[in-house]
């Protein structure tokens, strides 16, 4: 950055060789971009606002409240993890290669927030909106696992799940994928816990600590129902059984706040997410107040893009004009609807029955 003489916002994409610690700069964007939006929403640091102030001649220590975590001079302190996953719509094209590389093939992306890698990868794979229930519990089978693991495709993560279930070691999967063993170890934790859940035949038999840990690891009620009850066909009844058992044990997600930097009223930050990994609510629910919940359209895809998101934005703006508290639930970091100053409360989380209807 110093060599290029850039003042303001800039993002750099580079390739890194973990074996030699060598890296190559692929791209430099000295402007606001989709990567900027992702970084801003992942950290709560308003890059566009700060870059505009710098362009006007302000210095970082003059933006926000100096000497506090609310100053633009202070790097954000994160107590959560973020996972970005692209959405590929490759099945909608005849003859297209499913292999992914340095050229962009995705049509959208999602961002999941949580307290562990296991949680955010499972949430993220559900958010993609292509019929997957998480890292495990999907009706996928690969005839040649070694080939699927050695080729980077949009389905390789699910090939890793099947490989772990079939007894592949982390070292063997690493040799085939070159994915860092740290990530493979976290994915193995999910598979191991799936096997633990499968030991129970009734929802009532699952101990409270086992069920709670399953939720901490990102398992949905749907996944737990599939592993414990092994239902066929319509799973609505079994899903509700797990939900009822979980609520009976008092296992509910906590609502946590992401503090934004350089905001005028940090204590009023409305940028929220849900997790089972901790207890306690950073905000209280709106009670006895008129409020409207708007469900976003999720990741961009072929046939649903920014025009649908703008419908959500118009909905929350209209609700506010009519005197209602506006609540947005969405998880697309590219969109205007997930800007935390567009509504009274933004829940950056899954658009699912389990998350939208907590009680």
Residue spans for each PLM region:
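Extended, domain-scale alpha-helical bundle/helix-rich regions
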Residues: 213-217, 223-233
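ATP-dependent carboxylate activation and anion-phosphoryl transfer catalytic cores
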Residues: 1-210, 214-218, 236-238, 248-257, ...
